[in-house]
């Protein structure tokens, strides 16, 4: 296994991404970035990045996935983490006095049922942990943030309500991406890819039939518009496979019936 020295991540100290890094890569240096574009753009031949790509409640993290597919980076590991959101205020704050909640857009979506019950203003910001730290700058007990329950150990803040996600089974998938395989997982039985169908009837269906013929199980199929090409779409695909020979056969067959097919990752999984 290659030693990982530096990992870039989107967010700030105390974020879910940082908690994943601390659990899996204790010896690496962590570098916080404000945007996914910056996070992925900083990766050199010896560095890596960790990005959240999908949540079990609200789906794909579009900005992360878009930037990943436009980069020349590959996915080398999937990490799945259970997410426990909490409503957090400054020490002494009371939930009945809260008038506004701030957090990352994904966190606000994942807790929408709870927030609708409060009937208060919601303000999206770039990071869950950053939203908590901004409470110190605002210095008001009428604003709360949504982030991880691990802030309960910080005496500057108080947990106003635990477990506020729309469903207790709330998980996020993270990808470790880079330019060289760190060889962290012995079994690489998952694939992520991007497919662009030809602009003719039946192209997508023909492509999907090839997966069936090769007995490959699709676990994700999601369409996204192609920027600059109105009404044309690309498809994010995940499928199960651990044979490079089958991947090669798949690519050869798909080139005959689609405009583009690119595998962006061959990886295994870790559950936290």
Feature map (PLM): residue ranges:
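Domain-level signature for soluble enzymes in the chorismate/prephenate branch of the shikimate pathway
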Residues: 1-272
């Amino acid at each position: 296994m290659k030693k990982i020295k530096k990992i870039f991540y989107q967010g700030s100290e105390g974020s879910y991404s940082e908690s994943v890094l601390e659990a899996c890569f204790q010896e690496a240096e962590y570098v916080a970035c404000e945007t996914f574009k910056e996070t992925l753009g900083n990766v050199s031949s010896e560095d890596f990045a960790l990005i959240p790509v999908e949540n079990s409640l609200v789906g794909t993290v579009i900005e992360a996935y878009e930037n990943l597919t436009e980069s020349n980076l590959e996915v080398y590991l999937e990490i799945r983490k259970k997410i426990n959101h909490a409503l957090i205020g400054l020490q002494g704050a009371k939930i009945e006095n809260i008038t506004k909640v701030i957090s990352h857009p994904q966190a606000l979506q994942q807790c929408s049922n709870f927030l609708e019950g409060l009937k208060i203003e919601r303000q999206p910001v770039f990071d869950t942990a950053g939203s908590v730290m901004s409470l110190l700058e605002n210095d008001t007990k009428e604003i709360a943030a949504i982030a991880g329950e691990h802030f309960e150990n910080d005496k500057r803040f108080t947990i106003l309500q635990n477990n506020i996600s729309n469903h207790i089974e709330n998980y996020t998938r993270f990808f470790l991406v880079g330019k060289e395989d760190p060889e962290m997982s012995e079994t690489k039985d998952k694939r992520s890819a991007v497919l662009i169908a030809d602009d003719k009837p039946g192209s997508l269906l023909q492509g999907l039939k090839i997966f069936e013929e090769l007995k490959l199980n699709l676990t994700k199929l999601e369409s996204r518009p192609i920027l600059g090409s109105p009404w044309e779409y690309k498809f994010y695909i995940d499928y199960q496979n651990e044979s490079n020979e089958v991947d090669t056969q798949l690519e050869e067959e798909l080139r005959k019936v689609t405009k583009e097919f690119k595998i962006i990752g061959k990886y295994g999984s870790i559950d936290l």
